[in-house]
């Protein structure tokens, strides 16, 4: 894509030239150096994603990104909890508040719900993370954008195999093949991951396929096809623990998890196509379409047989989704100075058949819920960048979004009325920014904007008993963002970033109650997030490499509501977080020795701030070797996580009604891996 964009946008190459050592980004929808983007944006490269890492969870590689907190639940039934500047911390499963994208195709549903497990890290070329108000140009995402880009196939057809195993009967095997055949470039990755889990009743299996093909249809047109598939059968859910249970035995599970055999099965398939066509040297048109299906069966930690309005303790969800987008990109001039413009329209739709059954101790029983749900999203955006002076550029953008929810109830019996209903949410979200180039390697920037985030269908799914049906009383949250920052990239030396931000959100969507795998939500009043993000990376060509990320985030409720006092901190959000990584390579022997350190401040587990998960520091060590010939390469690694055997809480279940807030992280554990590649 970068090579194509370079040709298509050649008219302004001189004006928008990339500085040495700079980073080209695509999360703003337009390829350009990060020094020219008035926003916080970071990239994690393939080597950083895969070298000495299991390539299963985003928590392995996103710790190095300031402003991002990834809480690894060690619970593959509920996926990671990812938050950006505190957005998404309310999620009891999956990802919310952050737009997930894979190869330009949405990995989030139209309602904003996303699953990090659908990303294939084994074939990722890079991960781009955008934070701040420019994410509003993607619509239903107030916190940011995570964009995973699959690598292209190598110039020479190459077969790559990987295998690792370690503690808790964990193993992963992968097979990847790719290459260039005339006008076609393709790559595919197939993997299986299995683990018994650190905790009892936490076994998981994940089979994953990711494929990408790119076909040049002449000099001006390129077609990209992508497909992904995920199978995750009978993934056990250990649920959370109380503080007393953690102190007694952090690996245990509560009796309800065994009694009701809490577990989840996921089947996810998705495919998409993007056609990129140069209308002229200065203008290109991009059209995308995608479609997919998702099946979920979840056994929760209760029967759900009573009262009459109960929805059961087994969720059966059959979903189809799809959409399309048309985008125009143009480079021209205004007042004799470069002007870059983009605009587009996007349409998405998701339809699901949701049923609920009584959980008869791990076996689905009588039907207690039956409904069809549809959510559709339409949006239009426009964005412009104008270099109005030699060292100044201004950025303006706006998006109009409408998200419509509709539910048709088919389970209408005595004591359980017709709960059909519908609700629409809409917003226009502007954003503006300015960049000043202090010198060729340093830029100062500022931005302001508005954000918009609707409830997801999962958040609308339940009301507190005895009420039934969807919770259409939930409103969308709306936010105002302001940020200033500095970036400097010195080729062959270092990369430094700093950002200060202030965010005020009204009608914040918060957890009301969470119990047995079921969660209800409500709107709070106003919240405020103020923070500082710092990033540093050495870009030396010698044997040493190092990087660090620091986040300070004061996220609190400005207004009291219910039993929650004004000034309480948002649950699931650490006030400070620090990550550091250093490595040394010895080229003659292929040896690499690395160390990672993560410090995370204490985290509130509920809105009333009555309990906290303690702060912790964890150290990991990695040892690797590499051998290679003219057509082959071999890599081995030994990874020791939590070297000091620290007891800590990896994630929390926000506002759990039973006080089971805590999800303990593993003790010291080891992985040994081998990777081989062969060119043909």
Predicted features and spans:
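Short acidic/polar hinge/loop motifs at secondary-structure boundaries
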Residues: 89, 97-98, 105-131, 473
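Surface-exposed extracellular loop regions of Gram-negative outer-membrane beta-barrel proteins
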Residues: 233-247, 349-360, 404-413, 422, ...
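Gram-negative outer-membrane beta-barrel transporters
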Residues: 327-330, 390, 495-504, 522-606, ...
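N-terminal periplasmic accessory domains that precede
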Residues: 58-61, 81-85, 98-102, 115-117, ...
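Transmembrane beta-barrel wall of Gram-negative outer-membrane proteins
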Residues: 158-160, 165-194, 199-237, 263-284, ...
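Membrane-embedded beta-barrel scaffold of Gram-negative outer-membrane proteins
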Residues: 276-278, 284-302, 437, 443-449, ...
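Face-selective signature of the C-terminal outer-membrane beta-barrel domain
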Residues: 222-230, 265-412, 437, 490, ...
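Conserved C-terminal beta-signal and adjacent last beta-strands/turns
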Residues: 215-216, 228, 384, 446, ...
């Amino acid at each position: 894509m970068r090579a194509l964009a370079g040709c298509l946008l050649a008219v302004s190459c001189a004006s928008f030239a990339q500085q040495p050592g700079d980073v080209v980004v695509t999360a703003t929808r337009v390829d350009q150096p990060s020094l020219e983007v008035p926003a916080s944006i970071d990239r994690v490269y393939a080597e950083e994603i895969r070298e000495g890492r299991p390539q299963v969870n985003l928590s392995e590689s996103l710790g190095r990104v300031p402003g991002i907190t990834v809480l690894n639940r060690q619970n593959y039934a509920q996926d990671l909890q990812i938050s950006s500047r505190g957005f998404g911390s309310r999620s009891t499963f999956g990802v919310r508040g952050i737009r997930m994208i894979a190869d330009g195709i949405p990995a989030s549903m139209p309602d904003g719900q996303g699953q990090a497990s659908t990303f294939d890290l084994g074939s990722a070329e890079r991960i781009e993370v955008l934070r701040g108000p420019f994410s509003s140009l993607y619509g239903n995402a107030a916190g940011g954008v995570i964009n995973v880009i699959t690598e292209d196939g190598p110039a020479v057809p190459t077969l790559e195999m990987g295998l690792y195993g370690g503690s808790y009967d964990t193993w992963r095997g992968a097979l990847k093949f790719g290459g260039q055949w005339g006008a076609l470039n393709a790559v595919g990755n197939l993997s299986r991951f299995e683990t018994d889990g650190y905790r009892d009743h936490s076994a998981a299996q994940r089979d994953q396929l990711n494929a990408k093909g790119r076909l040049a249809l002449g000099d001006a047109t390129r077609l990209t096809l992508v497909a992904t598939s995920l199978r995750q059968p009978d993934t056990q859910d250990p649920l959370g623990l109380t503080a007393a249970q953690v102190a007694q035995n952090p690996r245990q599970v509560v009796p309800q998890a065994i009694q009701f055999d809490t577990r989840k099965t996921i089947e996810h398939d998705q495919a998409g196509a993007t056609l990129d066509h140069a209308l002229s040297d200065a203008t290109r048109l991009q059209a995308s379409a995608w479609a997919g299906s998702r099946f979920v069966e979840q056994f929760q930690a209760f029967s759900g047989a009573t009262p009459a309005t109960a929805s059961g303790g087994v969720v059966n969800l059959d979903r189809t989704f799809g959409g399309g987008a048309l985008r125009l990109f143009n480079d021209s001039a205004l007042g004799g100075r470069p002007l870059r413009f983009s605009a587009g329209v996007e349409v998405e739709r998701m339809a699901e058949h949701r049923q609920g059954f009584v959980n008869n101790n791990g076996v689905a029983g009588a039907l207690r819920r039956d409904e069809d749900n549809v959510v559709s999203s339409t949006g239009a955006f426009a964005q412009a960048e104008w270099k109005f002076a030699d060292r100044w550029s201004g950025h303006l953008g706006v998006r109009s979004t409408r998200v419509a929810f509709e539910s048709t109830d088919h389970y209408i019996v005595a004591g359980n009325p017709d709960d059909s209903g519908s609700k629409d949410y809409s917003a226009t979200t502007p954003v503006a920014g300015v960049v000043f180039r202090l010198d060729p390697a340093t830029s100062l920037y500022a931005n302001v904007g508005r954000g918009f985030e609707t409830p997801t269908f999962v958040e609308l799914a339940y009301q507190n008993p005895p009420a039934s049906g969807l919770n259409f009383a939930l409103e969308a949250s709306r936010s105002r963002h302001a940020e200033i920052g500095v970036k400097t990239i010195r080729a062959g030396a270092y990369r430094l970033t700093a950002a200060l931000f202030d965010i005020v959100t009204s009608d914040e969507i918060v957890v009301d109650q969470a119990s047995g795998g079921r969660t209800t939500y409500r709107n709070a009043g106003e919240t405020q997030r103020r923070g500082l993000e710092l990033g540093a990376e050495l870009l030396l060509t010698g044997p040493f490499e190092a990087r660090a990320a620091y986040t300070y985030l004061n996220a609190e409720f400005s207004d009291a509501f219910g039993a929650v006092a004004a000034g309480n901190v948002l649950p699931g959000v650490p006030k400070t977080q620090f990550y550091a990584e250093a490595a040394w390579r010895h080229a003659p022997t292929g040896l690499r020795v690395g160390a990672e350190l993560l410090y995370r401040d204490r985290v509130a587990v509920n809105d009333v701030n009555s309990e906290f998960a303690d702060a912790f520091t964890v150290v990991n060590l990695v040892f690797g070797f590499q051998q290679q010939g003219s057509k082959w390469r071999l890599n081995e690694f030994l990874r020791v996580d939590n070297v000091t055997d620290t007891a800590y809480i990896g994630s929390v279940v926000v506002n759990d009604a039973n006080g089971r807030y805590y999800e303990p992280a593993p003790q010291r554990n080891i992985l040994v891996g081998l990777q081989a590649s062969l060119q043909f």
